A protein has these predicted regions:
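Charged, low-complexity intrinsically disordered terminal segments
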Residues: 1-333
Length: 333
């Protein structure tokens, strides 16, 4: 990502929930400052809660170098006092034509981990998209930038909701593929609806990795229903959490999932932070949305949904590799 910023010629749009002032954050800051010095228009959008441990001086340095920095939804006298919704999206768009989205934040945990005895980077996934879909990613950034810099409502508004966009990759450089940029908004449940549709139509497999898996009744029913129909349904979740209380909520769903034929694995490493799914070796989702109430129904999220058999095969291979480093749960703890 820093290399992409380093090669930018016109614009850099960076949207992050977590942006730490550690060695990783400093690398990004240096890359942004260097880009601004070259005359590149640089904008950084961060979430107020996500950066609560980052000193203000870190962002003052960026602003002083010509980088536009905006903080989404700081506390104030409005609905929910600015506690929710949060901007949980992770997005980088360079020159409006190339972008990265996924679950990766800017901090040392994604490089070295945070445990002292057994350091290992957090397991996460992002996807780099080039071509016409880059314009959709730029449009998605503009939506959130406008929400953060104007008086537009920070929650979802029926009159301001935009349709999900899709774009074919350039057939001269890529095999035909369809890329949909799905903007998760409060109350829209778009990724949840997509899972339910895919669960009803899947013929072979549904494999899901979710860092904070606290699904709704309808999501559980969609997955268990697919498993009862003979679809290979697999769920990968962490065994260690940066928020330990989430595990108690996740384990609550194991009994029903296992009883209906859904297979569950727990990642053995420090933290599995990915938010991905692959259906029938063809439909791949990579983004910031976890299957829990915050991710699906409350926060602003961003996911890329890609129809491509080659990418689907790669996603399945990556998933199987992760399972080799995980433990299958065969009984409720």
């Amino acid at each position: 990502m820093c290399q992409m910023i380093g090669g930018a010629r016109q614009s850099v749009d960076l949207e992050q929930y977590i942006f730490r002032a550690d060695e990783v954050g400093e690398r990004f800051a240096d890359a942004l400052i260097a880009a601004a010095a070259r005359g590149v228009t640089c904008r950084v959008l961060v979430d107020w809660i996500g950066i609560r441990g980052t000193p203000r001086s870190f962002f003052r340095r960026l602003r002083a170098a010509g980088v536009s920095v905006c903080v989404f939804n700081p506390p104030g006298w409005r609905r929910w006092f600015g506690v929710v919704p949060r901007d949980h999206r992770k997005l980088l768009v360079v020159d409006g034509a190339r972008g990265v989205t996924g679950g990766i934040g800017i901090g040392k945990e994604w490089r070295t981990g945070v445990l002292k005895r057994r350091r290992s980077p957090w397991r996460d996934t992002a996807v780099c998209i080039e071509g016409p879909a880059g314009a959709d990613m730029t449009r998605a950034f503009e939506h959130m930038w406008k929400r953060s810099t104007s008086n537009e409502r920070r929650s979802s508004d029926r009159h301001m909701t935009r349709k999900s966009h899709g774009a074919h990759l350039d057939p001269t450089t890529d095999e035909p593929a369809l890329v949909g940029i799905v903007e998760g908004e409060p109350g829209r449940l778009r990724v949840s609806r997509a899972l339910q549709i895919q669960s009803a139509s899947a013929e072979k497999s549904i494999w899901v990795a979710s860092a904070y898996f606290v699904p709704s009744f309808s999501e559980v029913e969609a997955l268990t229903g697919a498993a009862r129909d003979g679809v290979d349904v697999r769920i990968l979740v962490p065994s260690r959490y940066d928020h330990p209380w989430v595990r108690l909520m996740t384990v609550h769903f194991y009994r029903r999932l296992l009883k209906n034929g859904v297979r569950v694995w727990e990642w053995n490493g420090e933290m599995m932070h990915a938010k991905t799914s692959v259906v029938d070796s063809r439909y791949t989702r990579v983004g910031s949305t976890d299957f829990n109430p915050l991710g699906v129904a409350i926060n602003f999220e961003l996911d890329a949904v890609i129809e491509d058999a080659t990418l689907g095969a790669q996603a399945e291979s990556m998933f199987l590799s992760d399972l080799d480093q995980s433990k299958e749960i065969t009984r409720v703890p």
